[in-house]
From Swiss-Prot:
SUPFAM superfamilies: L-aspartase-like (SSF48557). One of its GO terms (molecular function) is fumarate hydratase activity. Its EC number is 4.2.1.2. This is Fumarate hydratase class II. Homotetramer. PANTHER family: ASPARTATEAMMONIA/ARGININOSUCCINATE/ADENYLOSUCCINATE LYASE, FUMARATE HYDRATASE, MITOCHONDRIAL. GO terms for cellular component: cytoplasm. The active site is at 188 (proton donor/acceptor), 318. Belongs to the class-II fumarase/aspartase family. Fumarase subfamily. It comes from Rickettsia bellii (strain RML369-C). CDD domains: Fumarase_classII. The keyword Lyase applies. HAMAP family: FumaraseC. The record marks 331 as: Important for catalytic activity.
Length: 463
């Protein structure tokens, strides 16, 4: 038999299954917003718990909370951070655009845990009240955006940066011995002048290095916290100096350089910092899409494609074509990239719709940003483990393609001029002969002169 308890809010009483710790406002949200299954991300819940812990500590320092109340809030948030109550945060993203119901979900659960410890009974509003104590000096309008920023920083530090560093190291290690492998370059998907395989991969390496730099630049504004602005940015019902001390507590707890935002009106009404950060994630997706597609093309084949790289064979690729193996890690990564690009469109539209004193698209903004961080992180790590680490060059085929390329003729430009070099290339292509044979046939160069000038090893460096 299911046991229920009665909770209440300004709308009256409501029944809640007694095994859960949330209160009336959370229950109403569950009943009023049966939309989708996209729950608030775990790291956002963790960030809200950090927020409430730090707020209680500051309120205690100011003398605005009794020690017994502050201590009970601190213990409750520690238990939440220890994942003891993960099933008590059930609300979906599709709720009020300020995130008020998730903020109250956290307030109610903390108060309920604290009350159970102090009285033996979960729920209720005494001795710990979800609004008067847990939410003291706060509004959902400043708390939720603060949690959004904390969650973005933590997810980036814990997942995305390590994943990109993992990919960077893998690309560096894989290509470090490829400086002697000279291959044909391609522009417009047509043959171009030679370069080394290491040089080609150095472009990918630099893209990832720049991605890491972009993240650090974009995080600078995300470190600024809205807490202390309360309802519309004026700080009503929040003690002077609360915002500064709060940011210091969060910085100490997370070991991240959080500071209070200098203008709380901007912090509540706009989410430009997160739109910018989403733009950085979008740029990273663009970079990874280019890298993955290049590796896909270079590994195409095995017999009728470019075939310059051997990609790891991880699983059967076709239900009808025996022996077929596909570049599945590339396909997974590029699908992730398209999702991240789409997420950025959502964040852009949501960020542009901050009306007057409050942007009310907060949940969808943070949901998409955190999803982008998670997908990019997981996909980068998977790409390293199941693709990059196992890539090997097909040296024989690389050499064969290079030596057949007509674009080696570019080395002749300084010696016989562009027009004569073009004649050699066209003659070779028209009659299916080598550049050397065409040069001799047209009486433009002797074999000895040709061999002295057209040296692929010399074409991959500036003279």
């Amino acid at each position: 038999m299911t046991n229920y308890r009665t909770e209440s809010d300004s709308f009256g009483e409501i029944q809640i299954e007694d095994k859960f710790y949330w209160g009336a406002q959370t229950q109403r949200s569950l009943e009023n917003f049966k939309i989708g299954k996209q729950r608030m991300p775990e790291i956002l819940i963790r960030s809200l718990a950090i927020l409430k812990k730090c707020a209680a500590k500051v309120n205690l320092e100011f003398g605005d909370l009794e020690p017994k109340i502050a201590e009970s809030i601190d213990k409750a948030t520690s238990r939440i951070l220890n994942a003891e109550f993960s099933d008590n945060f059930p609300l979906v993203v599709w709720q009020t655009g300020s995130g008020t119901q998730t903020n109250m979900n956290m307030n109610e659960v903390i108060a309920s845990i604290a009350n159970e410890e102090l009285t033996g009974m979960k729920g209720g509003k005494s001795p710990v009240h979800p609004n008067d104590h847990v939410n003291k000096g706060q509004s959902s309008n400043d708390s939720f955006p603060t949690a959004m920023h904390i969650a973005t920083v933590l997810a980036t530090r814990e997942k995305l940066i390590p994943a990109l560093n993992n990919l960077l190291t893998a690309l560096q290690n894989k290509s470090k011995d490829w400086d002697s492998i000279i291959k044909i370059g391609r522009t417009h998907l047509q043959d171009a002048t030679p370069l080394t395989l290491k040089q080609e991969f150095s472009g990918y390496i630099t893209q990832i290095e720049y991605a890491l730099e972009r993240i650090e630049d974009a995080l600078k504004k995300v470190y600024l916290l809205a807490q202390g602005g309360t309802a519309v940015g004026t700080g009503i019902n929040s003690r002077k100096g609360f915002d500064i001390k709060f940011a210091e507590e969060v910085a100490e707890f997370t070991k991240q350089p959080f500071k209070t935002a200098p203008n709380k009106f901007e912090s509540l009404a706009a989410h430009d910092a997160l739109v910018e950060f989403s733009g950085t994630l979008n740029t990273i997706a663009v970079s990874l899409m280019k890298i993955a597609n290049d590796i896909r093309l270079l590994g195409s084949g095995p017999r009728c494609g470019l075939g310059e790289l051997h990609l790891p064979e991880n699983e059967p690729g076709s239900s009808i074509m025996p022996g077929k193996v596909n570049p599945t890690q590339v396909e997974a990564l590029t699908m992730v990239c398209t999702q991240v690009m789409g997420n950025h469109v959502t964040v852009t539209i949501a960020g542009s719709n901050g009306h007057l004193e409050l942007n009310v698209f907060k949940p969808v903004i943070i949901y998409n940003i955190l999803q982008s961080i998670e997908l990019l992180s997981d996909a980068a790590n998977s790409f390293v483990t199941h693709c990059v680490d196992g890539i090997e060059p097909n040296i024989t085929h690389i050499n064969d393609l290079r030596d057949k390329s007509l674009m080696l003729v570019t080395a002749l430009n300084p010696h016989i001029g562009y027009d004569n070099a073009a004649k050699i290339a066209k003659e070779a292509h028209k009659h299916g002969i080598t550049l050397k044979e065409a040069a001799k046939k047209l009486n433009l160069l002797s074999e000895e002169e040709f061999n002295k000038i057209v040296v692929p090893e010399k074409m991959v460096r500036q003279s």
